Amino acid sequence: MKQRKFFGTDGIRGRVGAGKMTPELALKLGWAAGRVLSRNGTQKVIIGKDTRISGYLFESALEAGLSAAGLNVLLLGPMPTPAVAYLTRTFRAEAGVVISASHNPYYDNGIKFFSTDGSKLDDAIELEIEAELEKPLVCVESHLLGKARRIEDAAGRYIEYCKGNFPADQTLEGLKIVVDCAHGATYHIAPNVFRELGADVIAIGDKPDGLNINDKVGATSMAKICETVLAEKADLGIALDGDGDRIMMVNRHGEVVDGDQILYILAVDAQKRGILKGGVVGTLMSNLGLDLALQALDIPFVRSKVGDRYVMEMLRENEWRIGGENSGHILNLDHGTTGDGIVAGILVLAAMRRQNASLEQLTEPMKMLPQVLVNVRFEGDSNPLDTDAVKSAQADVELQLGARGRVLLRKSGTEPLIRVMVEGDDHPQVLAHANRIADAVKAAC
């Protein structure tokens, strides 16, 4: 397949005002996408964004480009990524566009597309859009220009959809839940969803100012929610990331429940109910403890490359329904077409109610092996993973760990980082091994 020039593993992403993330490119991208998408269907596209201050800039540029190509635009304003996927389906739009850099800091932003069925855009269509980007922008005739309007009830529609994933004969009454919205796109949605299902909700990270998204809050910064769960004597906590497609949880003891443990809960619940279709897809980063726990229940488990795109591909290939990443991207294809943090939280709460169990009781059978992840920043085109020193350090650590451990080195698909992951039985040993390999990577950068 032809190499993509603009689109990465999750759309286009980068520092605002530099590289690809400029208003000029956003305008041209809107036009190019419009040219490709206008060949069929409804001639309308949905745009949603997270709470970054630069979202206004890119929303306007994309709107102008799409209109110049003759497509009508439906503007959602701040809206979680999975909400854009859902509303793209329900409005029967040609595509959905999300302006977000997910868990990245406010000074980054990104643009990604959903197809008309709410799934990520096919590689072939992205390549068609890239081909159009190489052409000069030519506006359609004035009478063919697209129009734009805001969808005022978008949040309400999505809230009702989320609630519909919880059993109609159950409520969350009696549960105290801390909900961390990461000052992101779920700030006006997630607390309301859980309140309307009956929970006593304490919301944090729910006051976005355009600059504070993911800043010491949310699914990538768990200290605040762990402290709040303990201080408020809450039953559990739910932490979402800036665009709402990731979830991490916290039990009543202030202990983090990650994506691997959430996958375990959902798989076991589905097995108990006789609705588990096949097995579970994790990634190369999934904890070995998940693999072993599912093996004990005769639930098949396979690993994809890192990235929810690859988890989805493997789910479709195997015709399975449940998969995800330890970082909190959870896919349940019986409940949506993309990772949805709010819905994943609802499904865990439903399992708690059905089994009359606490969050810690549901995760107790799964024994997590100590896992250490060290990120090493690098610049330039060279690949430090190809050096003899790094390969030697990795081989030596793997020899010492044996069958009860793993080493994984990989480049991030969204940031200039080398990720060093080491897993084994003994945490101090695992930490020492990870730092040793990370030092070798740093020296090679």
Swiss-Prot record:
Binds 1 Mg(2+) ion per subunit. The modification Phosphoserine is found at residue 102. PROSITE patterns: PGM_PMM. Keywords: Isomerase, Magnesium, Metal-binding, Phosphoprotein. One of its GO terms (molecular function) is phosphoglucosamine mutase activity. Activated by phosphorylation. InterPro entries: A-D-PHexomutase_a/b/a-I (IPR005844), A-D-PHexomutase_a/b/a-I/II/III (IPR016055), A-D-PHexomutase_a/b/a-II (IPR005845), A-D-PHexomutase_a/b/a-III (IPR005846), A-D-PHexomutase_C (IPR005843), A-D-PHexomutase_C_sf (IPR036900), A-D-PHexomutase_CS (IPR016066), Alpha-D-phosphohexomutase_SF (IPR005841). Catalyzes the conversion of glucosamine-6-phosphate to glucosamine-1-phosphate. Belongs to the phosphohexose mutase family. This is Phosphoglucosamine mutase 1. It comes from Shewanella frigidimarina (strain NCIMB 400). The gene is glmM1.
